[in-house]
């Protein structure tokens, strides 16, 4: 390696671009009537360094959060832009806006009703929490607090009288807090069926190799920078998105209320999840409309990170770590028995270390295929660094049945997309192709994988940008650190977070799964398919609209030649002729 460029000089941060792909356009005012003394052409001349006089009647500039998806900034710096748009303050403002809707029932006929609908601002509050966020908060608690115990503290925050209800204008609290692990299990089965051709698969299947699409940072990067990989992205929604769709569709149809009356908060390890929640593909315009993306009601109304959970408690005037880790208050039953059993299963299933810290999409596919082929073995081949690993499923006879890989971090992702880039064909008759087309088919590493698990963060989702870091003041104070933590301390801290993530009770697996045909890592694919089919029947919506999503190339006009106005032409011409004003 060159002495000028070392590994220490490299990182995954890309500075935001200075140009906006959606510049503010000022519409021309109506032309003055003929004969007006002021109707002659006037050109405003501005000296260098001066700003034009603001027009008092100019319309306010508006840039929607969806427009941010098309910005020229990078995906890893998106959190700096979006943190003020979806934050803990938005949660508090919403809770204090009006009395919450209350679920009543069931009555003698098994029907539920909702009280408070006469107030148009009233909402039914539901929160979903990721296991990575629970692990981060558990590590911050210290003293051997497990992920499950941290989860109970979060439930006390959202459901208990000593949580957010304390000090609020209306004393509002959430009706339910659900675990995104349940939605993750559904996405694992859906993803396996998509890759292996199972019973449930999207009509528009992804091209091989199928690439994970549950990481919004990676998806945003692909849409803006490498659109040629979009056909490879898995069509299965992320656990956050699937949970949002499940809650909004089920509750709105069962309770006969509009989707906007249900307010869904997600607690995630990543700031880029705020980007995901703003996607037009994840609104009721898709599942309740014509199936096409549009500006409808979001399936996830707000996303906050693990760090912001602490800020949420502090804004109400108490310390999150003072909350009890005991069982939370009893909540109403979900108004559908099968979905209730799916969302609120007893126990807490332990995460598999082999599956990693990002949900285990690839590992589940391998284990599912292995379960169908007795005697086969999974072989692991380490890559160039810890965030690149290749996996092979070897049949009992010795042949390779399936290959998959794990690529974490943008440095490794860039190597992956380079291998997937289509070859440039020569324009000369009989010319040789360029790039990857020179290599024989099947020889290029990365192209013969059946599945690739791609995550933007090195180390996976437990190392997300919204996680609590070792140099955060709360960790420094609770650990009593005398000096500022460095990279080595962060590595040790990450190990603590990972240990909390893998903590759990093995007895938490569903006992009823054992009686079914096939169980993979404690998950019954047939049981998940039954739940998904029931969900589709209950809502009257095709599963294609509920469980799958789409992607689109984001085209930027940065660097493209733009049309000049008459004023700009006059100024440019004067500069050329007279040497400038």
Curated annotation (Swiss-Prot):
GO terms, biological process: iron-sulfur cluster assembly
An annotated Gene Ontology molecular function: iron-sulfur cluster binding
One matching Pfam family: Fe_hyd_lg_C
Gene Ontology CC entries for this record: cytosolic [4Fe-4S] assembly targeting complex
InterPro entries: Cytosolic_Fe-S_CAF, Fe_hydrogenase, Fe_hydrogenase_lsu_C
Superkingdom, taxonomy of origin: Eukaryota
Positions contributing to [4Fe-4S] cluster 2 binding: 215, 270, 457, 461
Residues involved in [4Fe-4S] cluster 1 binding: 20, 68, 71, 74
Keywords: 4Fe-4S, Iron, Iron-sulfur, Metal-binding
Similarity section: Belongs to the NARF family.
Stated role: Component of the cytosolic Fe/S protein assembly machinery. Required for maturation of extramitochondrial Fe/S proteins. May play a role in the transfer of pre-assembled Fe/S clusters to target apoproteins.
Protein name from the UniProt record: Cytosolic Fe-S cluster assembly factor nar-1
Source organism per UniProt: Neurospora crassa (strain ATCC 24698 / 74-OR23-1A / CBS 708.71 / DSM 1257 / FGSC 987)
Recorded name of the encoding gene: nar-1
């Amino acid at each position: 390696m060159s002495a000028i460029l070392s590994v220490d000089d490299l990182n995954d941060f890309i500075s935001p671009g200075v140009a906006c792909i959606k510049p503010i356009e000022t519409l021309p005012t109506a032309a003055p009537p003929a004969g007006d003394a002021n109707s002659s052409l006037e050109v405003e001349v501005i000296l260098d360094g001066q700003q034009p006089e603001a027009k008092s009647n100019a319309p306010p500039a508006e840039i929607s959060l969806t427009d941010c998806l098309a910005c020229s900034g990078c995906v890893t710096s998106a959190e700096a832009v979006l943190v003020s748009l979806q934050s803990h303050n938005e949660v508090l403002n919403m809770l204090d806006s009006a009395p919450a809707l209350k679920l009543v029932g069931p009555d003698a006929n098994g029907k539920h009703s909702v009280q408070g609908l006469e107030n148009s601002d009233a909402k039914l509050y539901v929160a979903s929490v990721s296991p990575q966020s629970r692990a981060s908060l558990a590590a911050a608690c210290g003293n051997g607090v497990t992920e499950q115990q941290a989860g109970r503290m979060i439930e006390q925050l959202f459901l208990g009288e000593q949580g957010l209800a304390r000090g609020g204008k209306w004393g509002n609290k959430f009706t339910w807090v659900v675990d995104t692990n349940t939605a993750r299990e559904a996405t694992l089965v859906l993803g396996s069926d998509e890759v292996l051709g199972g019973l449930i698969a999207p009509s528009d299947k992804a091209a091989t190799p199928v690439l994970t699409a549950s990481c919004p940072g990676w998806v945003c990067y692909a849409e803006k920078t490498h659109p040629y990989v979009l056909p490879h992205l898995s069509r299965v929604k992320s656990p956050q998105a699937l949970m949002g769709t499940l809650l909004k569709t089920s509750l709105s149809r069962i309770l006969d209320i509009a989707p906007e009356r249900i307010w869904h908060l997600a607690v995630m390890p990543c700031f880029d999840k705020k980007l995901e929640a703003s996607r037009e593909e994840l609104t009721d315009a898709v599942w309740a409309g014509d199936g096409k993306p549009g500006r409808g009601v979001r399936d996830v109304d707000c996303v906050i990170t693990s760090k912001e959970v602490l800020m949420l408690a502090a804004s109400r005037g108490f310390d999150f770590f003072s909350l009890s880790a005991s069982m939370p208050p009893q909540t109403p039953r979900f108004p559908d028995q099968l979905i209730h059993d799916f969302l609120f299963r007893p126990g807490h299933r332990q995460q598999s270390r082999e599956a990693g810290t990002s949900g285990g999409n690839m590992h589940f596919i391998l284990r599912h295929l292995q379960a169908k082929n007795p005697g086969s073995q999974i072989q692991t081949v380490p890559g160039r660094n810890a965030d690149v690993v290749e996996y092979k499923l070897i049949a009992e006879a010795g042949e390779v049945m399936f290959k998959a890989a794990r690529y974490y971090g943008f440095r490794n992702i860039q190597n992956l997309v380079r291998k997937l880039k289509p070859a440039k064909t020569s324009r000369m008759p009989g010319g040789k192709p360029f790039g990857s087309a020179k290599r024989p088919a099947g020889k290029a590493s990365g192209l013969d994988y059946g599945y690739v698990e791609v995550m933007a963060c090195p180390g996976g989702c437990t190392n997300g940008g919204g996680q609590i870091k070792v140099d955060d003041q709360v960790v420094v104070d609770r650990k009593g650190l005398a000096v500022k933590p460095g990279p080595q301390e962060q590595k040790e801290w990450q190990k603590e977070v990972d240990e909390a993530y893998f903590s759990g009770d093995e007895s938490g697996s569903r006992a009823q799964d054992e009686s079914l045909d096939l169980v993979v890592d404690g998950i019954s694919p047939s049981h998940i398919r039954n739940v998904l089919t029931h969900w589709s029947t209950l809502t009257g919506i095709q599963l294609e609209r509920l469980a799958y999503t789409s992607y689109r190339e984001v085209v930027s006009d940065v660097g493209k030649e733009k049309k000049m106005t008459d004023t700009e032409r006059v100024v440019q011409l004067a500069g050329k002729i007279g040497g400038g004003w």
